[in-house]
Amino acid sequence: MENPNIKIVERYLDALRAKDLSRAPVDPDVQFEDPLTTPSSGIKAWTEFVSGMLPALNDVRAKQHIAEGATVATLWEADTVWGVIPIFEYFRIHEGLIKEAKAFFDPRPITNAK
């Protein structure tokens, strides 16, 4: 039986693909971080950060999910103007929303282009 939290992460990735963050199941008090930002929290900070990346995003492809309880670890690819970037992201789900997201990827394709 598939962990229902995988569907929540898939909805998140679908929102990125559609470039419609209003569809992302993200908690108002979300905590997030990745190699391009310091640990941050709150839907406003998350929306500002992710909105800045959306223009460079061409597609999103989920490759694999590993789920246990409230956590989902997802390997996905961001097809961007800088090339395809593999991302491994840890999600913690609470009451149907993403409460925490930590992405791990090599930022050099992005930082070297600036």
Describe the role of every protein-language-model region:
Residues 2-28:
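Short acidic-aromatic low-complexity motifs
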Residues 1-2, 39:
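Alpha-helix initiation/capping motif
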Residues 7, 17, 33, 44-114:
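A beta-strand edge to alpha-helix "cap/lid" segment located at domain peripheries
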Residues 15, 34-39:
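Short N-terminal helix-initiation segments at or just after the protein's N-terminus
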Residues 28, 38-48:
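Short beta-edge strand/loop motif at the mouth of beta-sheet-based domains
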